[in-house]
């Protein structure tokens, strides 16, 4: 192709922008393959390279600054977008790129950026409408994550297996839910605050956080880790929708436990081994309110009773928890004789947490509570459920989340590469399986998508369907070659594979027939 055409082609494909006047001048001096390769490197070193190629990935990740459904409220998840851009500009290996997005929180000593990377699967829709069932839409989000993992990372339609075995490809109905089990134990629950979030403290509060971290540095590792995680994520905690069996009360707006005079609700199946304190965030507008907790049943033993301070805003309350072990139901009760016969709530509870032994001085504990109350910028991330509250995964008969079949354990489809015994049966193990060199689909899918971006059509034309009903590769050996290079020569670094393609004579030829 003429140089004028080729520089325009390169600039648009690599940076998403037309070439500048100086680029055109510099390219006119390119007279050898070596000069051409250096010019490609120069284009790929520009910040706009990451912005252009990140946009391709962000479409696959269904990135949006809103939550979807009828309200489509805003979502603050731009740090994930910026992380993707930075990853492409830094030429991060797709091994790490995928691992961080699927399981950054499960890496050893994860950094903030590793948590932010897990925003990949927090781009699911979130239903903020009052009266909806949070569990229904949590399940819908998990199903979306399963389908996206296969669409984006394998170029394979997996969604129809939700309802029945695949009619054309060797994927069984129960294998869908075995795969879903990898993704079914994260803390997100379709809550209005989109928890869990990573909290970003403002400049004026960072010193307060740093001072607290220094003060707890001498604590045992387990306690120190717990405190740091709670301040950073406000986890583990229980949201208001954990409560059920309301009497003279209700789940208000899906976000608060509201109990009137003599009202009650159940907190089911709480595990209290090692619990020393109950921490809850509440409001109580009317003076004279009393909170009471019974164990075992609505008529069970009273284990806690406290007169509440009057507050219209969310206030933190800590109560000493009685020695107990095992699992059982607990019941919240509300009393305020002044509200008898009235529709006013005695109190509202947003969330509660069961705290272990923390060994904090009074001053340090007050600082801990102050940091919890500090207003922060919050960004949705992935976090794993505590093991004591891990979910069971079931086959959904005909894809109906309400009709459970057999219980299943996390596994991958039998026709794919084997899941190695040294990998944990969680999202980190799944990420290892995806990027393993033995995976027949991942590298081919990436190479095919890169080719499509540069030529307008993939070697496999059906980008999302590498299955038996998708288009056959137009040049199968070429696709295999690019996948091999990507894995074994380039260590899955995207710039190297893109460079090989744009430096080829095929890419540089004239587009005229």
Residue ranges of each PLM-predicted region?
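Sequence context surrounding c-type heme c attachment/ligation sites in exported
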Residues: 106-210
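Short His/Asp/Glu-rich catalytic/ion-coordination signatures at enzyme active sites or charged loops
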Residues: 19-27, 31, 63-80, 126-133, ...
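Extracytoplasmic
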Residues: 218-371
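Conserved AdoMet
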Residues: 52-53
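Active-site regions of oxyanion-processing enzymes, predominantly non-cytosolic
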Residues: 93-97, 179, 329
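Activation corresponds to long, low-complexity, non-globular regions
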Residues: 189-237, 360-383
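Primarily short, surface-exposed interaction patches in extracytoplasmic proteins
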Residues: 1-8, 18-48, 64-108, 218, ...
């Amino acid at each position: 192709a003429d140089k004028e055409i080729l520089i325009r082609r390169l600039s648009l494909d690599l940076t998403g922008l037309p070439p500048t006047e100086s680029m055109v001048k510099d390219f006119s001096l390119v007279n050898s393959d070596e000069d051409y390769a250096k010019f490609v490197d120069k284009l790929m070193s520009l910040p706009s390279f990451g912005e252009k190629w990140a946009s391709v990935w962000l479409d696959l990740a269904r990135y949006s600054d809103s939550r979807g459904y009828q309200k489509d409220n805003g979502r603050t998840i731009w740090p994930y977008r910026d992380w993707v851009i930075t990853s492409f500009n830094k030429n991060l290996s797709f091994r790490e790129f995928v691992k961080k997005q699927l399981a950054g929180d499960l890496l050893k000593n994860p950094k903030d950026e590793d948590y932010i990377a897990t925003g990949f699967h927090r781009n699911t829709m979130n239903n903020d409408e009052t009266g909806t069932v949070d569990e229904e839409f949590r399940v819908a989000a998990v199903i979306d994550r399963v389908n996206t993992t296969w669409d984006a990372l394998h170029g394979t339609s997996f969604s129809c297996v939700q309802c029945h075995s695949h009619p054309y490809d060797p994927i069984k109905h129960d294998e869908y839910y075995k795969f879903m089990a990898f993704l079914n134990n994260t803390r997100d629950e379709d809550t209005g605050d989109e928890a869990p979030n990573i909290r970003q403290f403002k400049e004026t509060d960072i010193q307060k956080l740093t001072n607290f971290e220094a003060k707890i540095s001498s604590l045992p590792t387990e306690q120190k880790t717990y405190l740091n995680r709670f301040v950073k994520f406000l986890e583990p905690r229980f949201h208001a929708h954990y409560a059920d069996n309301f009497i003279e009360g209700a789940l208000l707006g899906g976000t608060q436990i509201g109990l009137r005079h003599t009202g009650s609700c159940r907190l089911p199946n709480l595990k209290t081994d090692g619990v020393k304190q109950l921490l809850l965030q509440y409001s109580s507008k009317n003076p004279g309110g009393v909170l009471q907790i019974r164990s075992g049943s609505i008529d069970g033993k009273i284990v806690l009773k406290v007169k509440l301070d009057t507050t219209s805003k969310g206030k933190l309350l800590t109560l000493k928890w009685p020695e107990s072990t095992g699992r059982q139901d607990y019941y919240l009760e509300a009393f305020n004789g002044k509200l008898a016969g009235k529709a006013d709530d005695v109190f509202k509870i947003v969330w509660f947490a069961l705290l272990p032994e923390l060994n904090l001085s009074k001053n340090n504990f007050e600082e801990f509570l102050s940091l919890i109350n500090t207003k922060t910028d919050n960004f949705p991330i992935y976090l794993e459920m505590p093991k004591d509250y891990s979910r069971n995964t079931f086959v959904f008969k005909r894809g109906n989340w309400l009709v459970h079949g057999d219980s299943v354990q996390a596994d991958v489809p039998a026709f794919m590469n084997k899941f190695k015994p040294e990998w944990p049966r969680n999202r980190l193990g799944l990420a290892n399986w995806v990027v393993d060199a033995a995976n027949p689909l991942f590298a081919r899918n990436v190479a095919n998508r890169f080719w499509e971006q540069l030529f307008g059509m993939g070697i496999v034309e059906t980008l999302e369907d590498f299955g038996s009903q998708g288009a056959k590769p137009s040049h199968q050996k070429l696709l295999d070659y690019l996948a091999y290079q990507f894995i074994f020569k380039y260590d899955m670094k995207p710039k190297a594979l893109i460079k090989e393609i744009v430096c080829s004579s095929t890419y540089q030829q004239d587009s005229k027939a």
